[in-house]
């Protein structure tokens, strides 16, 4: 099973919710909250659904919130994949 990378996460975010004009997703966004990146809870839930469909990783609703950072989300997804392997 392929690990989710930051580039892969960027692709999912843009596909699910678009890209805020004021945010450069190509920069170092690992430790910026999704709220600061312009993604609300609905966008994050759509992204989580896509992660589940594409990678087979179901994230708990309590894990997904606007204070989450891409680094933490990547750790959650990749950690769940490692446990399932």
From Swiss-Prot:
Alphabetized SUPFAM superfamilies for the sequence: ACP-like
Pathway terms, separated by semicolons: Antibiotic biosynthesis; granaticin biosynthesis
Disulphides: none
PTMs per UniProt: 4'-phosphopantetheine is transferred from CoA to a specific serine of the apo-ACP-like protein.
Limits of the Carrier domain: 3-81
Keyword Phosphoprotein assigned: yes
Residues spanning the signal sequence: none
InterPro entries referenced in this protein's UniProt entry, alphabetically: ACP-like_sf (IPR036736), PP-bd_ACP (IPR009081), Ppantetheine_attach_site (IPR006162)
Modified residues (O-(pantetheine 4'-phosphoryl)serine): 41
UniProt keyword Disulfide bond present: no
Keywords attached to this entry: Antibiotic biosynthesis, Phosphopantetheine, Phosphoprotein
Pfam family membership, one: PP-binding
UniProt feature coiled coil, ranges: none
Gene Ontology BP annotations: antibiotic biosynthetic process
Function summary: Acyl carrier protein.
Name of the protein: Granaticin polyketide synthase acyl carrier protein
Lineage, uppermost ranks: Bacteria, Bacillati, Actinomycetota, Actinomycetes, Kitasatosporales
């Amino acid at each position: 099973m392929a690990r989710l990378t930051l580039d892969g996460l960027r692709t999912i975010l843009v596909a699910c919710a678009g890209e805020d004009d004021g945010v450069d997703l190509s920069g170092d966004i690992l430790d910026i909250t999704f709220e600061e990146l312009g993604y609300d809870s609905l966008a994050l839930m759509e992204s989580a659904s896509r992660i589940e469909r594409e990678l087979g990783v179901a994230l708990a609703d309590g894990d997904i919130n606007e204070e989450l950072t891409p680094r933490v989300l990547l750790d959650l997804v990749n950690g769940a994949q490692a446990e399932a392997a």
